[in-house]
Amino acid sequence: MDRKENITPNTLEIQKNDEIEGTFCHELFENSFFNEKLCQELLVELPNINKTASSTRIIKWIISNVDTCFTSHHDDNDLYQIKNYSKKIEDKWKEYRQILEKYT
């Protein structure tokens, strides 16, 4: 059996539901914490996810919302702050973003 068939299509859907604790999106959107380990775990799963219109939409949604978090963090008029922000984390996100974009 192909490994892609073993991976539930819910892998990305779980990320999209930012109320599910223990996901990269939940940590960043709800807890304002960029969890690099959870982001890396998501990236590792990408090759195992069938490319569909839905998966492409969700990946674009993740990219857009993470970008918004960084934009909000830098906006003096916005109360949202990434608790563990550093230039290094933002630079890492730019690398991770390029990987995600390959799957859209």
Name each model feature, range by range.
Residues M1-L43:
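Short terminal alpha-helical segments
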Residues S32-Q40, A53-K60, S86:
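Amphipathic, non-membrane alpha-helical segments in soluble helical-bundle scaffolds
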Residues I63-T104:
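Amphipathic alpha-helical binding modules
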